[in-house]
Amino acid sequence: MNIRYIKNYLASKVGCHIVVKYYGSRNKRERYEGVVYQAYHNIFTIKLCGGEIKSFSYIDILTKTIQIYI
């Protein structure tokens, strides 16, 4: 898997339901559920159920800081 593949994949999924699991430092884990909102050059955004918008980097997927489920 490479960055180009991830960008193209997420760009094709704009408007689709997504679950993002974030694995931070010190065992901090968060789960976000929403819709793929935009796919930009370096980041992608998701619109959460409450209307909040979160952004993530494609590098986060490669480094396994986040996992996505579509």
Where are these regions (language model features)?
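Short glycine-rich, low-complexity segments
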Residues: 1-31, 47-70
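Short aromatic-glycine-enriched beta-strand elements
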Residues: 42-46
